[in-house]
Regions:
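N-terminal Rossmann-like FAD-binding beta1-loop-alpha1 element of flavoenzymes
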Residues: 8-31
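Glycine-rich FAD pyrophosphate-binding loop
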Residues: 28-45
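Glycine-rich active-site loop/strand segments that organize a redox cofactor
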Residues: 52-84
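Conserved redox-cofactor binding core of oxidoreductases
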Residues: 96-183, 187, 231-234, 254
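A conserved FAD-binding loop/helix module that cradles the flavin
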Residues: 195-207, 366-390
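An anion/pyrophosphate-binding glycine-rich loop and adjacent beta-alpha core
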Residues: 211, 217-324, 328, 381, ...
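Short FAD-binding loop at a beta-strand-to-alpha-helix junction that anchors the flavin cofactor
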Residues: 352-371
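Conserved small/polar residues in nucleotide/adenosyl-binding loops
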Residues: 433-439
Length: 439
């Protein structure tokens, strides 16, 4: 069969995939594969913002590095943390060139907010829908590139390697299409749909990690899974959606089943602004003490117009569920949110498989340690996808492209167990996964 050749194939069209495409040399022919429409990705769901040292009069790299290491339990890759923090501001500034509209102060400077685990105001944001703002801006930029082909609503049925060539079997519009490249970037996101309750989009199924594993890539620390302490709890409909870290950053209180503050008992200094894993664990301690799994988040003491203007998306979503966060506490509970482990990569996003790169949540750069600091995820997606692009650019041979004749390996014929995904989701309830086995 014939495989159409590309210089680079990017699987995934969130921030990592889009930003990589924008930083690749314009002489390269690039194919981007999206599982759904371009905006239906995890990146677009990110609310809080991008953490970076933008105000050097009040912040510095060492403070951001320290916060990242503390949140990560000092299990971080310090070299990659330094890359993340020191190169991050350049990429945040570059977003402005693509039209990203960060909230501004009256003097025109970027408004930097505070989130849990940070000792300084350093989160650039767009209301409470920063991810969507960044994704839509980057999409506009990519669509202007004549060297990039985007296929939406695709299903990657197969990805294997023969020599230096990656072979792709893609289902698109009901037909099989075959592609090949010597440079593959996996930007496929996380594993949220392995869990019953997750803040992730429906496409976060971990298939990119599986494809990498099948090709011999190192897979690292899959037990490093983060639970966000404040997901809106709709137990009746078995749904949850994220209530941004920034709500606590703006002063919201965590309340127990008696609608009493409790974080001061466990974190007398940081209280509600402790890192995510700490807050989630403390909520479990409080649940054990009270015998109830009911928790609330309360910012209703703040000015109602401030709440509506600062958190318009969250306000409207909880209002649809029957709660007015300007007048009352809203029910929340820890929910699966982010994978810190994944496909092992080095400081420029390369795996141990020649020509295979990984970026974003599917990759394990080690910058997050055992627990990600709030708003470091979009920063990681930007910095390391750019470094991947720079590495590919450096090794670009400017070869002629055409088609490759090859046989694609046939499926082994083994039927998939019916309902296995649903069964896995049901056996991983949130109460069993806040604490890892070794803890």
């Amino acid at each position: 069969m014939k495989f159409k050749e590309y210089d680079v194939i990017i699987v995934g069209t969130g921030v990592s995939g889009l930003y990589a495409a924008l930083n690749l040399d314009s002489s390269m022919q690039i194919l981007m594969l999206s599982k759904r429409e371009l905006t239906l990705c995890n990146s677009a769901l990110a609310q809080g913002g991008v953490a970076a040292v933008m105000d050097t009069s009040n912040d510095n790299y060492e403070l951001h590095i320290k916060d990242t290491l503390i949140a990560g339990g000092y299990k971080n890759n310090i070299d990659n943390v330094r890359i993340l923090v020191e190169q991050g501001p350049k990429d945040v500034k570059n977003l402005l060139n693509y039209g990203v509209d960060f909230d501004r102060k009256q003097d025109g400077s970027i408004d930097l907010t505070l989130e849990g685990g940070h000792c300084r105001h350093r989160i650039a944001h767009h209301k409470d829908s920063t991810g969507f703002e960044i994704v839509t801006s980057l999409i506009e930029g990519v669509k202007k590139l004549s060297n990039v082909t985007i296929l939406e609503n695709t299903h990657l049925l197969g990805l294997t390697k023969r020599g230096d060539d990656f072979l792709f079997d893609v289902l698109h519009e009901g037909k099989h299409s075959y592609y090949t490249t010597k440079n593959t970037i996996l930007a496929t996101g996380g594993i949220g749909r392995v869990y019953d309750y997750t803040t992730n989009s429906a496409i976060a199924t971990g298939d990119g990690i599986q494809f990498a594993y099948n090709m011999g890539a190192d897979i690292q620390h899959l037990s490093y899974v983060q639970f966000h302490p404040t997901a809106f709890a709709d137990h009746e409909n078995r749904e949850c959606f994220l209530v941004s870290e920034a709500v606590r950053g703006e002063g919201a209180y965590l309340l127990n089943c008696n609608k009493e503050r409790f974080m001061h008992k466990y974190e007398p200094e940081r209280k509600e602004l402790a890192p995510r894993d700490v807050v989630s664990k403390d909520m479990m301690k409080e649940q054990k003490e009270t015998g109830s799994d009911k928790f609330y988040l309360d910012i209703s003491y703040k000015d109602s117009e401030f709440i509506k203007n600062r958190f318009p998306m969250i306000y409207n979503k909880v209002l649809e569920k029957g709660y007015d966060m300007t007048k009352e506490p809203i029910p929340i509970y820890p929910c699966q949110h982010y994978l810190m482990g994944g496909i092992g990569v080095n400081g420029h996003g390369a795996t141990n498989v020649k020509g295979l790169y990984a970026a974003g949540e599917c990759a394990h750069t080690g910058v997050h340690g055992i627990n990600r600091l709030a708003s470091n995820s979009l920063l990681e997606a930007l910095v390391f996808s750019r470094l991947i692009a720079e590495d590919i650019n450096k090794n670009n041979t400017h070869r002629e492209l055409g088609t490759l004749e090859a046989d694609y390996p046939s499926p082994d014929g083994k039927p998939l167990p019916k309902g296995i995904r649903t069964e896995i989701r049901h056996i991983m309830p949130v109460s069993y996964t806040h604490l890892r086995a070794h803890e």
